[in-house]
């Protein structure tokens, strides 16, 4: 047996250094690597395969809803970006500019797209004339560039992958309904695929997307008590339509401006998976999003019949799950640690004694429970166990979030919680931006959302003591 040249390295305990724990998992689980360009990353096959599964879910849903995929240019002329004032002001600090083509200075600077509203609007203005042309439901899978000052793989990078949807509608009601429909789909993605519970709600005026009338969001809570914005959907009203002169003849022959929505999820969802589910042994992947759902590890594979049986088992299971057989010459113990670190949801062990008894041993990654199953029932048992693992991981994440969700009715309580018990803080707000600004200045917490499911935890604003208007989820965030 060849000597193993690579051994599973220890991962920094999350309680010791959460940021280093996260970085260790990204690198050791081979999800991504650093690029020579500051703030950019190389998404490795293990990481990209997770993104592909996210893509598959979202793309299927969007097509069910009637969306079509398109591809817009990566460059935006400066004059086009300037057309919507609030929008350009919101993105100006993060824009990367192209000033030369070869040795020649360009007559006009080109922006490397930070987002594509301006390109879609320019196109829609050319192709929409009548209400019969509406709605237009377009989506794009691409990368965008935002020149971030502080970066971390998946969570905040200079270039990242996303999907961006851009739709225009005949009426405000239709556009708002569509925006919320997409948000609900994102929520289902997180809970049904990523086993990650979210809070759905609306952003405050201060936190909404630049140029939007309303921004809706799904917010999740990480192991360290910080919030992460997992996806957003924006109702842009007629702001962009007017700025770009997109008009259509309505049912009475009158010229009107369509109502616009835009929405996105990004590769930061991979970072969320790490920080919601991971532990000190490494990555812990929810089964439905895992590129490999089960790994077969033959025990004493040099003995007669073991490898043959393992291959037969793989062939059988490949019809129902995404399965891998590791028949390398590394020791079984090394393989156990390796696949535990990489987060494979289910390990299947089979050796000579198992073959004699017509059985295999299933080991769950989420809680390390072992179950012996008959080979005659293994296809259905593996599928059932993967569903059980998903439900267990979702429930565990929901329990962890709820245990770190607190209520504050005064600033003293708020400050004590944020410093000593990081998590979501539910607190009432008067609606005054000055209070929102003060809370951020004093505590570093931002308003994450006004949840759709409102409750009253106090009659007064947590900051100023005046009559409260809304419950807000607050927290420090990525």
From Swiss-Prot:
CDD domains, sorted: ProRS_anticodon_zinc, ProRS_core_arch_euk
InterPro entries in the cross-refs: aa-tRNA-synt_IIb, aa-tRNA-synth_II, aa-tRNA-synth_II/BPL/LPL, Anticodon-bd, Anticodon-bd_dom_sf, Pro-tRNA-ligase_IIa, Pro-tRNA-ligase_IIa_arc-type, Pro-tRNA_ligase_II_C
Primary residence: cytoplasm
Keyword Protein biosynthesis: yes
Gene Ontology biological process terms in this record: prolyl-tRNA aminoacylation
Keywords: Aminoacyl-tRNA synthetase, ATP-binding, Cytoplasm, Ligase, Nucleotide-binding, Protein biosynthesis
A cellular-component GO term for this protein: cytoplasm
Enzyme class: ligase
GO MF annotations, alphabetized: ATP binding; catalytic activity, acting on a protein; proline-tRNA ligase activity; transferase activity
E.C. designation(s): 6.1.1.15
Pfam families per the UniProt record, alphabetical: HGTP_anticodon, ProRS-C_1, tRNA-synt_2b
UniProt subcellular location: Cytoplasm
Catalyzed chemical reaction(s): tRNA(Pro) + L-proline + ATP = L-prolyl-tRNA(Pro) + AMP + diphosphate
Disulfide-linked positions: none
Family statement: Belongs to the class-II aminoacyl-tRNA synthetase family. ProS type 3 subfamily.
HAMAP family per UniProt: Pro_tRNA_synth_type3 (MF_01571)
Subunit organization: Homodimer.
Role description: Catalyzes the attachment of proline to tRNA(Pro) in a two-step reaction: proline is first activated by ATP to form Pro-AMP and then transferred to the acceptor end of tRNA(Pro).
Domains as described in the record: Consists of three domains: the N-terminal catalytic domain, the anticodon-binding domain and the C-terminal extension.
Protein's UniProt name: Proline--tRNA ligase
Organism: Clostridium botulinum (strain Loch Maree / Type A3)
């Amino acid at each position: 047996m060849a000597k193993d040249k690579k051994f599973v390295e220890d991962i920094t305990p999350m309680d010791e250094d959460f940021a280093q724990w996260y970085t260790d998992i990204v690198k050791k689980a081979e999800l991504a690597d650093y690029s020579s360009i500051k703030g950019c990353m190389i998404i490795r096959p293990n990481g990209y395969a997770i993104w592909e599964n996210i893509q598959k879910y979202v793309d299927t849903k969007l097509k069910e809803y009637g969306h079509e995929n398109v591809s817009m240019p990566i460059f935006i002329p400066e004059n086009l970006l300037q057309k919507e004032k609030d929008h350009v002001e919101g993105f100006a600090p993060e824009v990367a500019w192209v000033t030369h083509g070869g040795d020649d200075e360009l007559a006009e600077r080109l922006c490397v797209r930070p987002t594509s509203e301006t390109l879609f609007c320019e196109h829609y203005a050319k192709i929409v004339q009548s209400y019969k042309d509406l709605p237009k439901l377009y989506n794009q899978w691409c990368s965008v560039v935002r020149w971030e000052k502080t970066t971390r793989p998946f969570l905040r990078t200079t270039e990242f992958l996303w999907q961006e949807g851009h739709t225009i509608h005949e009426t405000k009601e239709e556009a708002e309904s569509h925006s919320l429909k997409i948000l609900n789909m994102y929520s289902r993605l997180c809970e049904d695929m990523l086993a990650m519970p979210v809070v759905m709600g609306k952003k405050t005026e201060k936190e909404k997307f630049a140029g939007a009338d309303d921004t809706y969001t799904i917010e999740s809570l990480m192991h360290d008590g910080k919030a992460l914005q997992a996806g957003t959907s924006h109702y842009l009203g007629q702001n962009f339509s007017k700025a770009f002169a997109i008009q259509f003849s309505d049912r009475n022959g009158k010229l009107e401006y369509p109502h616009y929505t835009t929405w996105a999820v990004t590769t930061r969802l991979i970072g969320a998976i790490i920080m919601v589910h991971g532990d000190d042994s490494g990555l812990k992947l929810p089964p439905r999003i895992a590129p490999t759902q089960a790994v077969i590890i033959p025990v004493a594979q040099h003995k007669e019949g073991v490898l043959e049986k393992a291959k037969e088992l793989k062939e059988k299971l490949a019809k129902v799950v995404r399965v891998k057989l590791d028949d390398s010459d590394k020791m079984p113990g090394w393989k156990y640690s390796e696949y535990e670190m990489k987060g494979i949801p289910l390990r299947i062990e089979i050796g000579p004694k198992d073959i004699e008894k017509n059985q295999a041993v299933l080991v769950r990654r989420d809680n390390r429970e072992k179950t012996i199953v008959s080979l005659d029932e293994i296809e259905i048992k593996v599928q059932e166990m993967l569903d059980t693992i998903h439900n267990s991981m979702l429930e565990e994440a929901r329990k962890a979030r709820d245990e770190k969700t607190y209520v504050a009715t005064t600033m003293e309580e708020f400050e004590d919680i944020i410093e000593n018990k990081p998590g979501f803080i539910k607190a009432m707000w008067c609606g005054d931006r000055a209070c929102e600004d003060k809370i951020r200045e004093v505590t570093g917490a931002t308003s994450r959302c006004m949840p759709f499911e409102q409750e009253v935890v106090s009659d007064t604003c947590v900051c100023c003591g005046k009559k409260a208007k809304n419950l807000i989820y607050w927290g420090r965030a990525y």
